[in-house]
Amino acid sequence: MGDSIHGRDLMSDRTTRRQVVQAGAGLALTATLAGCGLGEGPSGGDTTQRITPKVDGDLVYFNWAQYLNPSLFKEFENRHGVTVRESNFDSMPAMMAKLQSGNHYDLIFPSAEFTHKLVGADRLLEIPRDKLEHADVVYSYFDDPWYDPDSAHTVPYSLYVTGLGYRADKIDSMTGSWRDLTNPDAEGRSYILDDYQEGIGMANLVNGFDLNAVDPDQLEVSKEYLIGLKPDLRGFTSDTITSMASGNAWIQHLWNGDVVNIRYRVDNPDDIQFQKCREGLPVGSDCFAIPVDAQHPGTALLFIDFMLEKAAQNVKWTGYPMPTKNS
């Protein structure tokens, strides 16, 4: 296990959600998106082809691990006589790389920023909202999101914020600040998310900068702040659930929904608490989207409609709110 700020704490479970999303994210994200080389990818089909929610084959599903109630897979399979073939990614750039290399998926879950890039590159099919029986449960706020005008290619899946999870059975007090990552009670058992956007964003907030600061001088200050945390940290990890549930982490930089899953895994759920930090909170969202080269877009659309119907059941399991009236 890597104990330095430059290393990663590797856990046995697959990586769970996630990737921070911030409207107008900074230069580092822009560089990552450019590196995806979407303009040079394999040619797709007609992004405006009219699709309908009907079975046209098994569902090839590509998402973060443990980011959807698994019982809903079985219910969908039994209802429609299909198989859900699940694959997982551990970062948004990894998802983009798979798409770019010619892998075919019927349903993906990009963050808002990456959705914006995919839409701009004509890599997503249009989703006919009028064909979704349960489309009216989605809040109208998402009728015209900045990342997908007129919500033509996506349906919102989740909302989340980033903060600090902590073990109340180990930590005597928290101050309500991101600076609690160096709380002496943690005894070197603090972790930062293995996500450069989250790390830099947190450091920007601590230093009084905009979450999405792009000024080179400010970013240098934030970089030095992160390096200065090294003596007080155990390392980076994306497997926040295993890290905290096992007791390996006493303070963990994480997404709010993971707290629910961690509480399922410990003897006393009240030991696991979530702190919103006063300097500010990154807020993000992920979407349902159908790649332009999907082999079974009808089944994918059918699954999206099914998930809108089952939103409450999904939220109870994942801990991540869905922007729907029935959840």
Where do the language-model regions lie?
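Bacterial signal peptide processing site
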Residues: 37-39
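Short beta-strand->loop
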Residues: 125-135, 154, 269-282, 291-294
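N-terminal secretory signal peptides
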Residues: 1-15, 26-33
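Ligand-binding pocket segment of bilobal, Venus flytrap-like solute-binding proteins
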Residues: 191-195, 199, 203, 210-275
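A structural signal for short loop-to-beta-strand junctions that line the ligand-binding cleft
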Residues: 104-110, 125-163, 189
